Swiss-Prot record:
Species of the source: Bacillus cereus (strain ATCC 14579 / DSM 31 / CCUG 7414 / JCM 2152 / NBRC 15305 / NCIMB 9373 / NCTC 2599 / NRRL B-3711)
Assigned protein family: Belongs to the UPF0358 family.
NCBIfam families: PRK13666.1 (NF010187)
SUPFAM superfamilies found in the cross-reference section: EF2458-like
InterPro entries xref list: UPF0358, UPF0358_sf
The protein, known as: UPF0358 protein BC_3949
Length: 95
């Protein structure tokens, strides 16, 4: 019973983190769809705040043993790759 509860908590933690990551990904995709300036201070502020918050959530979940560190790193890495693609797309549009 205890191991079932732990597994349930782990699944919930991962689902919540993935939902938060999806929100950030949608923000990045909206920006990419409109290809507005990614250096916009408001956009950068919101994205930085969201990424920092998610990284703290991931760290907390890892420290509690709810997710593996590799899972958290993979989640954050995917978002960072999407952000990099946004900057590249904007740079290519400018040329």
């Amino acid at each position: 019973m205890a191991s079932e509860t732990v597994a349930n908590h782990q699944e919930k933690a991962l689902a919540l983190l993935q939902a938060d990551a999806e929100k950030i990904l949608r923000l990045i995709k909206v920006q990419m769809d409109h290809l507005t300036m990614p250096q916009c201070p408001l956009y950068e502020e919101v994205l930085d705040t969201q990424m920092f918050g998610l990284s703290r959530e991931v760290d907390f979940a890892v420290r509690l043993g709810l997710i593996a560190e590799e899972q958290g790193k993979a989640m954050l890495g995917e978002l960072e790759r999407e952000l990099s693609a946004l900057h590249e797309a904007f740079t290519n549009k400018q040329q």
